[in-house]
């Protein structure tokens, strides 16, 4: 298995913070978003290579970071330049995966991740779930009640008995489920090959966007492959997409840590809930 880390975005909402430095190399509590991923991936022996996909603007930043020993991992690390130089000509998340697959000539199992989130779950737990489902495609997330959060990303309707995803939408106006999905995906080899078919259809359909959730949504909607859902509760996945979130990340992490502690001390109670849009925390 190879892990593909999407780092080709421009993070324009973070202003000067990411003007000359990629978001993946920003630090939270002394560790970059990228290093948080690498630490987790080190716990999965089946991953033999980590492929970092950068845009042309920040490619040298990643090469320099690797040379400076700022990518600590026991995996082979390959850094690719997708050739784009602005937000306007970006390839998009799935487009970057397709680019990487072609570049390295790979057709096997794939783990696709973004490198701009803080999280406290273990990626190895999701991988174990993937294996337990006979290596079936896997997305992750948790139950969500906030309409704002549900409309802002990928939303799954999940069979509670089998964990199979019955519908999946990316940024729906009217959500058809209550499970908000994070941008992290496990695909078997057969599904990895379908990425190229998806990209061919995307070129013909302007309604298919750039976000990574459009591919698993396409898989489910068009009955291309089964997808299963791993619930990370009581753990968290924080999209650090705004300056407010980044500058208040210590408060958010403290609240997340308290919620996990509360959950395990009171597993039958429902009082240990952190609002997923973090608005109450960062006021």
Identify the residue ranges that each predicted region occupies.
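Active-site glycine-centered loops adjacent to acidic/histidine catalytic or metal-binding residues
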Residues: 9, 116, 242
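A structural signal for short hydrophobic beta-strand segments in well-ordered beta-sheet cores
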Residues: 25, 155-158, 229
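Conserved beta-strand termini and adjacent loop/short-helix elements that scaffold enzyme active sites
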Residues: 53, 80-83, 141, 171, ...
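A short, conserved beta-strand element in the Rossmann-like catalytic core
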Residues: 117-120, 236
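Conserved core of the sugar-phosphate nucleotidyltransferase
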Residues: 119-203
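N-terminal nucleotide-binding beta1-loop-alpha1 segment
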Residues: 1-19, 76-77, 275-282
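Conserved N-terminal catalytic core of the sugar/cofactor nucleotidyltransferase
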Residues: 2-5, 13, 27, 31-112, ...
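Conserved alpha/beta core of the MobA/IspD/sugar-nucleotide pyrophosphorylase nucleotidyltransferase superfamily
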Residues: 3, 178-283
């Amino acid at each position: 298995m190879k892990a593909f880390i999407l780092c080709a975005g421009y993070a324009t909402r973070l202003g000067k913070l990411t003007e000359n430095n990629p978001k993946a190399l920003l630090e939270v509590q002394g560790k970059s978003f990228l290093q948080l991923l690498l630490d987790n991936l080190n716990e999965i022996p089946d991953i033999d290579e980590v492929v970092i996909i950068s845009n042309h603007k920040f490619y040298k930043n990643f090469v320099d970071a690797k040379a400076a020993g700022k990518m600590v991992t026991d995996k082979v690390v390959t850094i690719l330049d997708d050739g784009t130089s602005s937000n306007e000509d970006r390839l998009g998340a799935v487009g970057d995966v397709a680019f990487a697959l072609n570049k390295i000539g790979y057709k096997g199992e794939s783990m696709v991740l973004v490198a701009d989130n803080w999280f406290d779950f273990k990626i190895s737990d999701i991988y174990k779930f993937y294996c337990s489902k006979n290596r079936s495609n896997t997305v992750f997330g948790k139950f969500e009640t906030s309409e704002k959060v549900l409309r802002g990303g990928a939303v799954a309707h999940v069979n509670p008995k089998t964990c199979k995803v019955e519908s999946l939408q990316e940024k729906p106006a009217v959500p058809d489920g209550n499970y908000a999905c994070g941008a992290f995906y496990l695909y078997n080899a057969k599904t990895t090959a379908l990425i190229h078919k998806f990209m061919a259809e995307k070129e013909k359909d302007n309604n298919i966007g750039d976000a990574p959730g459009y591919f698993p949504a396409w898989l489910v909607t068009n009955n291309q492959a089964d997808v299963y859902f791993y619930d990370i509760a009581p753990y968290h996945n924080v999209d650090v997409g705004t300056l407010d979130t980044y500058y208040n990340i210590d408060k958010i992490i403290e609240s997340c840590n308290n919620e996990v502690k509360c959950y395990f001390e009171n597993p039958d109670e429902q009082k240990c809930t952190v609002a997923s849009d973090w608005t109450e925390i960062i006021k």
